[in-house]
């Protein structure tokens, strides 16, 4: 079997994904990733390659352990890693590796098509990939949970409001809780919508590709939109897997 292992260390958790060619066969999430938790994967699968990526500080000890545990080559994703897309960002050394990976996956899924890539995680990133497979740039703002939390932490009286798919989000809240919820949710939807409209004008973008922990929630709040929205929960992992295979062949 042709298995590859993708390790994506995010801001608040780590995601481990096993691929058979381009198909996801197993996904695991960890709060804090340790080598011991990866042992069952190495025992279960005969891997042909591993890729490790972190948006935070590189875990050198983990990388060393990975190389000790498997004979498969381990690719550590950096800003110097060869990519199947062109990055025209002015400061590529500061560009989040997760944003790069999501863009790579979007190009693979929608070749020669300009798309808006939205990753709704701890932070909300909204990036443009043009029809020539170029990462053009994008925006970074607080994610949903961070917005709710900041209103609670940086004010004297506003409560911490929870959110779920079933919650109503009126245009204008009728009490403090709904005012906060509607302000945050409608605000973030308006932010995405405005970015899409601008990307459509500038790059003929016709599709939003949505991923991240809050992507399912946001899709439910944008269901009445006329925009074409595709949700891919494993977008970053798919991009990292594509980068791994690209480097195997180059």
Please give the residue ranges for each predicted region.
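Short beta-strand-to-turn element immediately C-terminal to the catalytic PLP-Schiff-base lysine
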Residues: 19, 127-130
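Nucleotide/phosphate-binding catalytic cleft detector across ATP-hydrolyzing
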Residues: 1-13, 17, 24-115, 132-250
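Catalytic metal- and UDP-sugar-binding loop of GT-A-like glycosyltransferases, i.e.
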Residues: 118
